[in-house]
Amino acid sequence: MKLLLFNDYRLGVLKGDRVVDVTRVVPGADHLPKTALGGEAIMETVIGDFDSLRAGLESAAGQEEGAPLADLRIRPPLPRPPNALCAFSNYQDRDTAEPRPPVYNLDFFHKSATSIVGYDDLVELPDLPEAIVFQPEPEFAYVMGKRARNVPEASALDYVFGYMNFVDISARGIPNRRTTFLHKSQETWAPMGPVIVTKDEIQDPQNVRVRLWLNGELR
């Protein structure tokens, strides 16, 4: 299932190039504020109670044709996540001149809540004279389905709800940086979406093609 938030943070299911509104399936959704926080609450309810809500979501999605995706304002599927954690070392198996040794002690950084925007929203580049270049990095994001800590590798995917596109915007060349905020976490620097794809739809998350379009151009 492909889940998204649209317009005033309604919950939708993407079918082809059309979106069906399934907000009514989520208990209490219509009483939440039509804001990023309200949308986050809806999606977190779906993630937390997906086993019990799935049949209703599938039924509701099958009853309507839906609206064209292109006619809707697509919001980030997790507009205010409690934690947006990114790793500095990704894609260890990519083609390089020299093989890379495995990384066992990863270093992480956070994206701020205000850095998160929808996949088609405008990314704002502030005046940072020290920055040599602003770089968008396409990422394959894991959406956690429950709390996890000290999880064995063999059962790691049991904690995953689904996956989504994510872009890490970085300002390169800033000298003497002591934190990641200035070059990683400013407003609009974390586009995501348009959808969360539930785990059952992707057989092997280690074998997914990740591509990036910048201003309509494939990079």
Which positions does each model-derived feature cover?
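Glycine-enriched loop-and-adjacent helix/strand subsegments that border the catalytic/binding cleft
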Residues: R75, P81-R219
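N-terminal non-catalytic cap/leader segment that marks the start of a structured domain
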Residues: M1-L106, D200-Q203
